[in-house]
Amino acid sequence: MSSSLLLIGVLCILGANSFASVGKTRVTQEPNAPEPIDCLLTTWSDWGPCSPCSEERYRSRSILKFGQFGGKPCIVALSDREPCDTRTPCPDERGHCGKQEFECENGYCLKNRLVCNTENDCGDFSDEDHCDETKRPPCGNREVDVSELGRTAGQGVNVLGMTPAQTAFQNEFYNGICDRVRDGNTAIYYRKPWNTAVLSYDTRGDKRFTSEFYSDQASTIKEIFKTKSQTFDVNLSVKLKPTESNVSTTIGGGFNAGRSSSMSEFLKNTKGTNPIYLHVKSNIQLGTFQMRKRDLRLSETFLEELKFLPSTYEKGEYFKFLETYGTHYSQRGTVGGKYELIYVLDNQTLSSHGLTAEDVNRCLGFNLGITIAADVAEATAEIKAKQCKTSRFKNVDEVRRSGVIQDVVSLIQGGTTATLTRLNELLSSNARLIDVEHYVEWAATLPQAPVVIRQELTPISELVPLKIPDSRTKKENLDRAVEDYVAEYSVCKCQPCLHGGTAMLIEGKCECTCTPFYKGDACEIPKSTFVPGQTAIDGSWNCWSNWSTCQNGERQRTRECNNPAPGSGGKSCPGTSVETGHC
């Protein structure tokens, strides 16, 4: 993503009467803990002009402070709307189709050759409603299955980690062409959607699971979000649930744990317990795709919501659009699934049994090389024959009953809803541990419900059609909204944690992940194992300044490495303190 991420203006100069606090809370404080910080918002902006298409007007607000140290989180909408009257007509987009085109009832333009060809090219069947004769179907008499890989192509991505609720593409449109691709595993032919310039089935999988062990929260959380923070300048800011849209996210796209209903609760439950974290992951690739550069067929709902976006920039409404469709879409990528779990192991219980974290890893079967093409029954038999040969445990159930595993966190992506629901139920009930058997069962469902696991991204604004009214303005507004969205939910608004702790912004609340030597909401409580001089403080960036005025087509902004500043041999902030952008 471009590094030109715009920060909303410096807000601390506003008067006290410009702030709105969200529900004061009282919490039981630890000794020496900082005072709780409640969510603090600006007051609402003035109402904007009446939008002629939606006949509504909008206003927005911003977040000044996120909840921290036990304070109330910011999980509120930043947009508001009300009905209004306007004499300005909504632009009528009908009647713009060419002479050689058919105009669908929903406004799409089709080539005349697609009318009455037995396929729903319009999306509302209006091209097939009045046919005295039908043309030869594009695929003739052959039955060609719909490709789930093709349906998934172009999947939206939200830079803060949320799974977009809808796709921008109509990937069951074929433009009257019967291009087929063959799945080498099943020998089944699938029809390639028009939107994909390239679609290929190429099943591959990691030969073995990658298993890593961590001794503290901070290292574990940083590792989980390392890939995201390397791709986008979002540091440790995570937003998995929409606040501007009432559309729920999909199962498996976020965070699920056994004893913890949220990542915040997971951090609280594991803080100060000295666990060992076993991080297990494996990827399965089913195929690859590349989207067309031009003439993409966009979904009717995407175009409709784009039409109703106000031309005057209203931050909250544009945030809602981004949370529905993504800040970016996948221009090309790899489709399949990610199997990722974190086991929280009780260090003391391990020691009392004379075991290591690697022993638990073997008992769970993640040291085995399980081929992804294996039959589920055969793979399960192989697992049971080889796993869990330790002096203490004979099988996985004995591991569960021993209390060695305190919690399991699921970061699984892909697989059918039924399979993911079952895994989540196992997590919450603790009736049975999730082990490599469940991986084999999950992998078998990926062809029915794959996701994009690696991608090259393009801003969602690039999908704005030139022919819609105010297309250039709305494209610029979407680019601005992405910058504002990242700045609005930035960890730079969090107060520094104490004693080398790392601040994270999770679901509207600043959380501190502590080093092994401290615990507490702010990492303020030393543990009994604390030895003075063991805590290095890594530097963290403060928020970006406002952009400078535009000169010779360029502008600048700056930030400081003082939130906190590095100390006691800690690392300096990664990245640059000065950013230049075009204007």
Q: Which residues make up each language-model segment?
A:
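Thrombospondin type-1
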Residues: S2-E101, E105-N112, D124-N141, S402-S410, ...
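Short hydrophobic/aromatic residue motifs in ordered secondary structure
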Residues: N120-D121
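Membrane-permeabilization and membrane-interfacing ectodomains
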Residues: R136-M504
